[in-house]
Amino acid sequence: MSDFLKTMAKQSADRAAAAQLRPAELDLPVMPLSLGSFDVIAEIKNRSPSEGALASEALNRAEQAARYVEGGAAAISVLTEPTQFGGEIEHLAEVVNAVSPIPVMRKDFLVDPVQILQARAAGASGVLLIATMLSDAQMDEVLDQFKGYGKQPTAAQ
């Protein structure tokens, strides 16, 4: 794994450890993964480590997501990683509230099942996993989390 991915995995694990959500504390409904078709997944991304700021601080993520849907996006991806990409879990909830029932996914460097629970609590329909960041044990734990929601995960390397 690259040094960048190692750093991102460590920071993500630290955020997961700080999370207070637990499955027994939340009664989450089953969310659809798609609306029956798939064309484009549009992305809300504030910053890039290589490009710097991609959006102004004044960006209204809800309005941007609604414009993506009006333009034909079948789903919206929201980058929630805070240190390198300027994202927050709250951004995910904003977008979900703006475009429901359009599927919205959390894009982050996820390493712990609690982070999937956070995504579900924010209303996400799915998450992106980076398989090369996860040990076999972590991948099994995360995939078991999906199955616990009655979902069949799709994974590719």
Segments (PLM) and residue ranges:
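Short, conserved beta-strand edge motifs with alternating hydrophobic and charged residues
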Residues: 129-130, 154-157
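Short, conserved, surface-exposed binding loops centered on an aromatic residue
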Residues: 120-121, 144-145, 157
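Bateman (tandem CBS) regulatory domains
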Residues: 98, 125-126
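Gly/Pro- and small hydrophobic-enriched strand-loop and loop-to-helix capping segments
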Residues: 127-136
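Active-site-proximal glycine-rich helix-loop-beta segment
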Residues: 72, 122-125
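Catalytic cores of alpha/beta
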Residues: 111-123
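Conserved N-terminal beta1-alpha1 strand-loop-helix module at the mouth
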Residues: 1-104, 111-114, 136, 145-155
